[in-house]
Design a protein with these regions (language model features):
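Beta1-alpha1 glycine-rich phosphate/pyrophosphate-binding loop at the start
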Residues: 35-104, 187-213, 220, 228, ...
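FAD-site-proximal beta/loop scaffold in flavoenzymes
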Residues: 144, 149, 155-171, 260, ...
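Rossmann-like nucleotide/phosphate-binding core characteristic of flavoprotein oxidoreductases
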Residues: 1-37, 55-59, 249-251, 255-263, ...
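A Rossmann-like FAD-binding core segment of flavoenzymes
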Residues: 92-134, 139, 194-293, 332-339
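N-terminal FAD cofactor-binding segment of flavoenzymes
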Residues: 48, 52-60, 141, 154-157, ...
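Conserved N-terminal Rossmann-fold NAD(P)-binding element of oxidoreductases
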Residues: 40-41, 139, 178-181
Length: 339
């Protein structure tokens, strides 16, 4: 499918076309290009790792679907120390501007499709067939929205089921939407959507909201928001064209009801984007890549940083620090002759 929901640009469209129809044969068969460090992922951790590596005078490539990563789906950012207030898009633009001040090969609108360990070298194959080689690989592919995995959800993604309030919220102006999830991301989404939509209904699986009290207080002050706890979403219902309702079960009474609405924003957390690496490096049960205090994985020369790793607290500022740490660890291992 070439359907794109939300924001995009020509580079993303080109990448989709290359994936679906292939690329020029000479490009696919080109000689493997070698680097000192390859960074997979273009979020705060990936960009930080690339900049720190480049500042050491190393040959660096960064392979990313988009610079900014999950940050681009954040409306307001007020906890990035020394930057009192910014937006996800502004931060993503600033990350790219800073990155391009250094001689880094930016390979945007691509994904890492395959990783092979050949001696001390790591060979990377991208989604468009390019191959790259380096002794150090820093995985900073972040995390993705978790899905409900209920009947009807997959069918109506992009047709009423959404995950990014910032991207898709304006499409529901003046309409009734639901937010599934009562953590910080869910309540932030509800607050944001309340300024656009006629009504916002929040459904939380647990018996109480999990969001910070300051967010809950803000939510309670909004007249067009309704909250239901102990509520399980069991089905997404539509008319074949778009979503029309959710089936909700009260976990205390076991009673089910249909809630008619125009859209639902699923905000139940993130899942580590580690699937392509799981046969190479060790992961925990949720799929996060296991790392030590220096961002090293169980494979010499492979490091992980940010939301894809086991580092606690998935925050922008922490991801930036972890990316820097991974780069410094890789450089230290290089100097010591480990990689």
């Amino acid at each position: 499918k070439l359907l794109h929901v939300g924001r995009g640009d020509f580079g993303e469209l080109l990448a989709k076309l290359e994936e679906q129809y292939g690329i020029d044969e000479t490009k696919a068969n080109a000689e493997v290009k070698e680097y000192d460090v390859i960074v997979a992922g273009g979020g705060p951790a990936g960009v930080s790792a690339a900049i720190y590596s480049a500042r050491k005078g190393l040959r660096v490539a960064i392979v990313a679907e988009r610079i900014g990563g999950q940050v681009k789906e954040t409306v307001g950012i007020e906890n990035l120390i020394s930057v009192p207030e910014t937006t996800g898009n502004e931060l993503a633009d600033n990350l790219k501007t800073h990155l391009l001040r250094y001689p880094v090969d930016l390979l945007e609108h691509r994904k890492v499709e395959k990783v092979e360990v050949v001696g001390k070298q790591k060979q990377i194959t991208t989604s468009v067939g390019e191959k790259f080689l380096a002794p150090a690989l820093i995985i900073a592919t972040g995390a993705s929205w978790r899905k409900l995995n209920v009947p009807g959800e997959a069918e109506y993604i992009g047709r009423g089921v959404a995950f990014c309030p910032h991207c898709d919220g304006p499409f529901y102006k003046g309409k009734h939407v639901a937010v599934v999830g009562g953590g910080n991301s869910g309540i932030e989404a509800a607050i944001d959507l309340a300024g656009i939509c006629s009504k916002v209904t929040v459904f939380e699986f647990m018996d109480e909201l999990k969001a910070d009290s300051v967010l809950q207080d803000r939510l309670k002050s909004l007249p067009n928001v309704e909250v239901f706890v102990s509520s399980q979403t069991t089905e997404v219902i539509g008319n074949g064209d778009k979503l029309t309702a959710l089936r909700i079960k009260d976990r205390k009474t076991e009673e089910e009801r249909l809630v008619e609405l125009d859209g639902v924003f699923v905000q139940i957390g993130l899942s580590a984007n580690s699937s392509v690496f799981r046969d190479i490096v060790e992961t925990n049960r949720p799929g996060e890549i296991m790392i030590d205090a220096h961002c090293r994985t169980n494979v010499t020369g492979i490091y992980a940083a940010g939301d894809v790793s086991t580092v606690p607290y998935k925050q922008i500022i922490i991801s930036m620090g972890e990316g820097a740490k991974a780069a410094l660890s890789a450089f230290d291992d290089r100097v010591r002759g480990i990689i």
